[in-house]
Curated annotation (Swiss-Prot):
Major place of residence: cytoplasm
Domain PABC: 662-739
Family: Belongs to the polyadenylate-binding protein type-1 family.
Designated gene of the protein: PAB1
GO cellular component: cytoplasm; nucleus
Molecular function via GO: RNA binding
SUPFAM superfamilies to which the protein is assigned, alphabetical: PABC (PABP) domain, RNA-binding domain, RBD
UniProt biased composition (Low complexity): 39-52
PANTHER family registered for this protein in UniProt: RNA BINDING PROTEIN (PTHR24012)
Protein name: Polyadenylate-binding protein, cytoplasmic and nuclear
Biased composition (Polar residues): 1-11
Gene3D superfamilies assigned: 3.30.70.330, c-terminal domain of poly(a) binding protein
Function per UniProt: Binds the poly(A) tail of mRNA. Appears to be an important mediator of the multiple roles of the poly(A) tail in mRNA biogenesis, stability and translation. In the nucleus, involved in both mRNA cleavage and polyadenylation. Is also required for efficient mRNA export to the cytoplasm. Acts in concert with a poly(A)-specific nuclease (PAN) to affect poly(A) tail shortening, which may occur concomitantly with either nucleocytoplasmic mRNA transport or translational initiation.
InterPro entries the record matches: Nucleotide-bd_a/b_plait_sf, PABP-dom, PABP_1234, PABP_HYD_C, PABP_RRM1, RBD_domain_sf, RRM2_I_PABPs, RRM_dom
Gene source species: Coccidioides immitis (strain RS) (Valley fever fungus)
Amino acid sequence: MSAETATNPPVDTTPGAAPESATNGSNANVAADTTAGEASQTTSSTTPTAQPHSASLYVGELDPSVTEAMLFELFSSIGQVASIRVCRDAVTRRSLGYAYVNYNNTADGERALEDLNYTLIKGRPCRIMWSQRDPALRKTGQGNVFIKNLDTAIDNKALHDTFAAFGNILSCKVAQDEFGNSKGYGFVHYETAEAAQNAIKHVNGMLLNDKKVFVGHHIAKKDRQSKFEEMKANFTNVYVKNIDQDTTEEEFRDLFEKFGEITSATLARDAESGKSRGFGFVNFTSHDNAAAAVEALNDKDFKGQKLYVGRAQKKHEREEELRKQYEAARIEKASKYQGVNLYIKNLSDDIDDEKLRELFSSYGTITSAKVMRDFAPESTSDSEKEAKKDSKEPETKEEEPKDEAGDNAENKDNKENKAESKKSEKKPLGKSKGFGFVCFSSPDEASKAVTEMNQRMVHGKPLYVALAQRKDVRRSQLEASIQARNTIRQQQAAAAAGMPQPFMQPAVFYGPGQQNFIPNQRGGMPFQQPGMVIPGMPGGRHGQFGGFPGQQGGRGMNPNQQIPPNAYGIGAQGLPMGMQGAGIPNGLNYPQMGQVQAPFGRGRGQAPSGQGMPPNVQGMGPGGQYGRGMPVQQGMGRPGQAGRGQGAPAQAVGQRDENASPNGLTLQVLNAAPPAQQKQMLGEAIYPKIQAQQPELAGKITGMLLEMDNAELLALVDDDAALKAKVDEALTVYDEYVKNKGGDSGEPAADANKSKDASQETAEETKS
C-alpha cells in the first residue's frame, strides 16, 4: 500500500497539520490522519443506502496493542461478525492503528456505527465509519468541512455532537499530535454538500468554548499550494528584526510610511516587562509598496543596528525552508565525503588517533583520523582535588629592573612556554569504543586502504575496514537483509515441510515391522520421521556414544553391523547410497538409548564383538566393501568370519576413552568427522542441557552457541556452570535484538542462526 498523503488545513497552520486531513487533499471521505499503508482503506464515503450490500466498517484511532480478539468481543455484541482484521506493518508486524470489521448484514453495521462510535478501547476512543474501497468516491471533496481555532477540550465526540444537527456525518476527526493533544483544528465530512453548506452558514464565526471558530469548505492541498504561491508573489506583510530596544512605535511607523500607505505597524513586546523584543511587522495596502520597503531598508543601519526586512512568513513555511536548508547541507556533506571516509572497527584499546593515522598514512593523504571514545569522567574525589591544589604553587613576582627589549623577549618566551604547557596537559581520554574513522583526500586512496587493511591483524585483532555509511542507510540495509533472510527461511521451511528439525527430537531408530521401515526391503534400514517415538521404548539422550548404545543383535547378524542411533552418514531418505537392499539381516530390535549396556547379546552364529563403531559412521557410499556400501571399520569382523558357535567374550561397550565427555564425545572422535557434521554432533550433545534451562528458546540458543569454536563447545559439554553462563549470555543478546527490532521470541527454532546474526549486526550498528 502506498502512504496516504493527507492535505493540510489553510495556509495559516503549521506543517504538523498536514497529515490530519483528507487523502491527497481531495478525499471526500476521510477527515482523519492516517499512517502509511492506510491510503486506500481509511475512509468511509458511502452509507448503506448507497451500497446496501456493504457491511464493512473502518475502525480507527486504535491503540497499537489492540488485537482482533478485543475487537471481536466488542463488535460481536451488536451482531454476528464475519471477519475482523487489524492492519499491520508488513515488516515489523506492528499495528497501524486501524482495523476492518465485517458483518454478515448491513443492519448490524448500522447499529455498530451508531452505538459503538467513540467507544473507549484501551483508554482511547475509537472512530468508526463505513469502509469505501472505491478511490473515485473517496477523492471527491464534496461535503468535507474544515474547522480551525478549536478549544483543546473539544474531542471527536464533542465535535460530532456539535455538527450532527446539520446532516448525516460520515466522518469526524480532531487533529492530534503524537501525545494525543488537540492541534486546534479538525474535519467533519457530511453525506451531502447541502449539509456541509448549512453547517458553514450557521457555525462559522460562532463561539465554541469561548473561542471564535472558523468553518469553511475543505480545500485540496494542491489547490492551497497554488493559492499560497500566488500569495507569496503578492505579499503585503513585512517582517522586521534587529530593531533597537529603545525604538518607539512612532519611530518604527515613520520609518516605513515614506514607502506607502500602511494599514498596521507594531512591535512585539514582552508580556511582563513591556520591553521590545527586537522585531515587528508592517502591513502595506499594496504589494508594490511592501516590495519597495524591503528593497530599500533590508541591511540598512538604524540606530546602530543593521535591520533585516523581508516578507513575513508563516511558521510552517519557515520550518519547511529550514528543513530544506538542513537537508541540502546534509546531502552536500555526504557527497563531499562519499567514497573517501572509512569505517574501522575491532580496534585494540591501546590504539589512539595518532596510531590510527600511522596505520593508514602509507595509503595516501589523510585529512582526519579519529578513534571514538567514551566520555572521560571528571575527577571529583577530595583527594584528587587536594592534589590539584597542592600542585598549584603560588607564583612569586621578582622585582628586577629590566629593559623594554628584555621585557618583550621574556613575555614572548612566557607565552610560548604557556602554549607548550597547554599542549602537554591533554585532557584525560575515555575508554576506546573499538572503532573509528579515517578520511582520505581521494576515493582511490580510500579504496586502496580498504583492500590492503581489511582483515589485517593489528595488535592481535583482525581489522574490519569498509566505506563509512550513514546510520539510516545502514539501518535500512540491515532491515532489508533481515527481511530477505526471513523470506528465504520461510520458503525453505515450506519446502522442507515434514522434514525433521535439528535439535527438536531425539534421533530414534525403530524396530522391524514399524511403519517407518521402507516396504519391500529385506532387513531395510529404518528412516526417521519427525516427532515419532515408539510407545514404551525408553528415551535416550543425544550423543551417548561410548562405542555405541547396546543393541541386541538378531540371528546371524554381526553386532558390529548394527547401526548406532546417530549415523551421520545416512542420507535424507534414511539410507546411504548403496545400502538399499544391502542384505542387512532383519534383526534390528528396539535400541536401548537410556543406558549403555555391557556386552552385546549375541544370537547363533554371531562373531565376537570388536571395538565399537564411532558415532559418526563415515564413508557410507558406493566405495565401501562391506555390505555393498558399508565400510569395514577397525575391529569389525568380515562377514565370512562369523560362524556358528563363535562365542569369544565381547568387549564391554561401557568402556570408553578416559578423556571422553559423559556423552562419549571426544576431541579425536570429533576431528574424525567432517566439519559439517561436527556441529551436528556438538549440537546434539548440548541441546538437552540447554532445553532443560530454556525449553522454548533451546533451538535458538543452541544455534547461537554453535558459532563458537569446537574445542570450547566440547568443554561446555562437561561444564554445566560454564554452559549456563553461555546460555544466559546468549539469552541476553537475543532479548536485546528482540527489543531493538520488535521481533517475536516465539519464532520457529530453525531461525536460531538468523537471530544470532541479526543480534550481532544490530550490536555492531549500534556501536557506530
